[in-house]
Swiss-Prot record:
<keyword id="KW-0679">Respiratory chain</keyword>
<keyword id="KW-0830">Ubiquinone</keyword>
<dbReference type="InterPro" id="IPR000440">
    <property type="entry name" value="NADH_UbQ/plastoQ_OxRdtase_su3"/>
</dbReference>
<dbReference type="InterPro" id="IPR023043">
    <property type="entry name" value="NAD(P)H_OxRDtase_bac/plastid"/>
</dbReference>
<feature type="transmembrane region" description="Helical">
    <location>
        <begin position="66"/>
        <end position="86"/>
    </location>
</feature>
<dbReference type="Pfam" id="PF00507">
    <property type="entry name" value="Oxidored_q4"/>
</dbReference>
<feature type="transmembrane region" description="Helical">
    <location>
        <begin position="12"/>
        <end position="32"/>
    </location>
</feature>
<keyword id="KW-0496">Mitochondrion</keyword>
<keyword id="KW-1133">Transmembrane helix</keyword>
<dbReference type="GO" id="GO:0031966">
    <property type="term" value="C:mitochondrial membrane"/>
</dbReference>
<dbReference type="InterPro" id="IPR038430">
    <property type="entry name" value="NDAH_ubi_oxred_su3_sf"/>
</dbReference>
<keyword id="KW-0472">Membrane</keyword>
<keyword id="KW-0249">Electron transport</keyword>
<dbReference type="GO" id="GO:0030964">
    <property type="term" value="C:NADH dehydrogenase complex"/>
</dbReference>
<keyword id="KW-0520">NAD</keyword>
<keyword id="KW-1278">Translocase</keyword>
<comment type="function">
    <text>Core subunit of the mitochondrial membrane respiratory chain NADH dehydrogenase (Complex I) that is believed to belong to the minimal assembly required for catalysis. Complex I functions in the transfer of electrons from NADH to the respiratory chain. The immediate electron acceptor for the enzyme is believed to be ubiquinone.</text>
</comment>
Length: 122
C-alpha cells in the first residue's frame, strides 16, 4: 500500500523539487548578472519629502495619520454607498432616509473637521 501511494505522488514530489531548484537558479542568476548601480532617481526623496534610505523610525508628522484616518472614514462611506446605489430601485423610503441621514452625519463631520483646521497643512 505504501509503495502505491509513493508511486502516485512521486511525480508531484519531482515537480516540487524541480520547481524549487529552478527558482533558486533563476534567483541566483539574477543576483549575479544584475547591475548594482544605484541611479540618482532611485536615491531622490519621495514626493512627501522623506529620503528613501533614512531610518524608518524617524520623526513622523502626526498630520499624516490624521489624513490617513480621514481617508479610511470616507473610503468606508463609499464602500457603504455602492451597495445602496446598486439596489436603489429596490430601496424603500425608509432606506432612502436612512442613507440620507448617514450622508448628512458624514457631511456634518467633514464640515466640523474643516472648521477645526484638521485639513490645514501649515
Amino acid at each position: 500500500m505504501n509503495t502505491m501511494i509513493l508511486s502516485e505522488y512521486l511525480s508531484v514530489l519531482i515537480f516540487f523539487i524541480f520547481s524549487f531548484g529552478l527558482s533558486c537558479i533563476i534567483l541566483g542568476l539574477s543576483y549575479v548578472l544584475a547591475t548594482q548601480n544605484a541611479d540618482t532617481e532611485k536615491l531622490s526623496p519621495y514626493e512627501c519629502g522623506f529620503n528613501p534610505f533614512d531610518d524608518a523610525r524617524g520623526a513622523f508628522d502626526v498630520r499624516f495619520y490624521l489624513v490617513a484616518i480621514l481617508f479610511i472614514i470616507f473610503d468606508l462611506e463609499v464602500a457603504f454607498l455602492f451597495p445602496w446605489a446598486v439596489a436603489l430601485s429596490d430601496v424603500t423610503i425608509f432606506g432612502f432616509w436612512t442613507m440620507f441621514i448617514f450622508l448628512l452625519i458624514l457631511t456634518v463631520g467633514f464640515i466640523y473637521e474643516w472648521k477645526k483646521g484638521a485639513l490645514d497643512w501649515e
